[in-house]
């Protein structure tokens, strides 16, 4: 079996495994989009909704009742209401395969849009891997491929540090090793209060971004640890992790 990548949703409602050669891409709010950027085999979208203890099962029953073209199917251990619709775009015909499924208090809407006649195995494998994470259960910490939500956090942190260096030191910020001394000046200036966690965390994230730019073999990942969901840097060769929070903020908090 081909190795896959694990995705744990923001808020850790659910997890799933998607193909190793796929990536996550920007989509509408509350919807997650995945596809292969090198060889397009279809767009997979998933949205999750939380409700009562039996909401997942009820969502499937409701879809079967209200959508006359929906049929009951089982994908691995997962019961779904399945339907499909065709459409044409610029002379090409596509099929949107739609699955409504759910487990416990979470309902899912999944779609896989492919060229007409193309297989849906990749989408079915993702759906079969779906797991709902229970709110009252403690899960071991996990490092997964970096999600878009953490990429946005990294970009925002970098932009804030860049603007702050320009504001206080009147110097351009290139995201290179030479900029670390400028960041140190900002840290030592007393302009950032000891309780400003987000600012100190942004400095830690930007330090890691410089390291990732300057040193080969470091890649961003997402850490899921209890309620904490954060970007971390991982050395691909040995799996060693650098946590931006511990670089700066943890030390400031401890009064170091």
Predicted feature locations:
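A recognition module on extended beta-rich or small alphabeta surfaces enriched in W/G with H and D/E
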Residues: 232-256
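Amphipathic, interaction-prone secondary-structure segments
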Residues: 30, 189-237
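Surface-exposed amphipathic alpha-helical segments
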Residues: 22, 108-141
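Short beta-strand
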Residues: 25, 72-74, 221-224
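N-terminal low-complexity, intrinsically disordered segments
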Residues: 140-198
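Secretory pathway targeting signatures of secreted, lumenal, and periplasmic proteins
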Residues: 3-62
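Signature of long, low-cysteine stretches enriched in small and polar/charged residues
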Residues: 59-107, 111-116
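Short, hydrophobic/aromatic-rich segments at coil-to-beta transitions
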Residues: 1-6, 31-32, 76-85
């Amino acid at each position: 079996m081909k190795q896959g990548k694990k995705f744990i949703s923001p808020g850790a409602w659910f997890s799933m495994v998607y193909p190793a050669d796929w990536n996550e891409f920007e989509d509408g709010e509350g919807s997650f989009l995945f596809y292969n950027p090198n060889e397009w085999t279809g767009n997979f979208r998933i949205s999750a909704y939380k409700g009562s203890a039996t909401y997942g099962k009820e969502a499937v029953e409701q879809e079967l009742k209200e959508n006359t073209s929906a049929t009951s199917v089982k994908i691995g251990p997962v019961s779904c209401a399945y339907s499909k619709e065709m459409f044409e775009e610029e002379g090409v015909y596509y099929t949107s395969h739609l699955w409504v499924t759910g487990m416990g208090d979470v309902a899912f809407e999944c779609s896989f849009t492919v060229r007409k006649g193309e297989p849906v195995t990749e989408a079915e494998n993702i759906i079969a891997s779906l797991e709902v994470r229970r709110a009252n259960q403690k899960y071991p910490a996990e490092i997964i491929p970096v999600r878009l939500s953490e990429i946005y956090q990294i970009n925002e942190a970098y932009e804030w540090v860049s603007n702050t260096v320009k504001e206080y030191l009147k110097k351009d910020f290139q995201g290179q090793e030479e900029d670390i001394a400028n960041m140190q000046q900002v840290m030592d200036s007393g302009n950032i209060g000891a309780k400003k966690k987000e600012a100190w965390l942004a400095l830690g994230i930007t330090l890691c971004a410089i390291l990732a730019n300057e040193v080969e073999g470091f890649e961003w990942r997402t850490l899921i640890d209890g309620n904490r969901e954060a970007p971390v840097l991982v050395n691909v060769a040995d799996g060693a992790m650098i946590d931006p929070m511990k670089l700066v903020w943890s030390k400031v908090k401890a009064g170091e």
